[in-house]
Structure formats: structure tokens, C-alpha cells
Amino acid sequence: MTLENTGLSRRKLLRTTAIGVPAAGMLAFGSTLVTAPAANALTDDGYWGSETTVELQKRLNSIAAVNSAVEGGLPLDGQIDSQLASQSSANPGLTSGWQWVSDDAASGSDTIKDLQRWLGVGADGLIGPSTISALQSWLGQTADGVLDGPSPAIVVFQRKLIEGNYS
């Protein structure tokens, strides 16, 4: 792809215009039509960061419309708030967007609560071995309760989120 303005790289264009891209995913740039479908797109890299969380939040909000166990109404902020600090080092596959606080101060996340409800496990909003094992089982992966970095389970999870496949 060649841009008429040589001072603006494709990467910078996609990064700076992704927020304001029209619904069609196109932006008129001078006389050139530029598409930005992959700007900030989720990739299946095996690390659960903010992009994975945003896609999960979107899916849980959609699922809430047909599954009364899931509350929905989640902000699309890519954040998993107030998680047990003891789970951080045990799960190196959980990266950006995770707020780790002391175990006695952790109050949980609404996103994790909805995920837990959807998986059919106790909904305290805290990621831990039980929730991770349930997610791994649903994904058809070894249920060891740990998300390594990179994690094969997170890769499968990301692929399901990308494809919209929840079966």
C-alpha cells in the first residue's frame, strides 16, 4: 500500500484513525480510500490482555440478551478489576488490563462474574484455579487451572472470540 503523504506510515494511519473509522471500516485519505479492519484487532497470541478482554466483554454483553444467567451491561474497557495478587505470578498468560491487588482487598470483576455464570461455576468475580479449569474444560484443553504465557487455552479462547464460536 502506498500513501500519498510519505510522512504518514500505514501503521500510524491505522493506529490514529482506528477510533474514528466509520462503520464501513473505511476512511477517505486524500484521494485514496483506506480500509482499517485490523486496527487494534485481537490476535491469537496466547496472552490474555486488554484486547482479549474487550472481545470477551462484547460477547458476554451479546450472550446476556439470550441467557438470563449472564447480566451483561459490561463496559468495553478491556479491564479486569480487583483480582487476587496471588494469581498474577501463577498465571503469566494474564497480561495487560488485569488489576492485581492484595488478596484481602480483592473484590472481583463484573466481567469475570459474567464469565463464571456463563461457565456455570461460582460467581465471585475472582479468577482462580476453578474458573480457569472450567474455561479450559469448555475449550477442550487440559484443565490444570493455570494460564501459562503463552497459553494454548488462551489461543483457543482467542480464536473462539475472533470467530464468534461459542460451541
Language model: regions and residue ranges:
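Cell-envelope/ECM-targeting effectors and their regulatory/trafficking segments
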Residues: 2-167
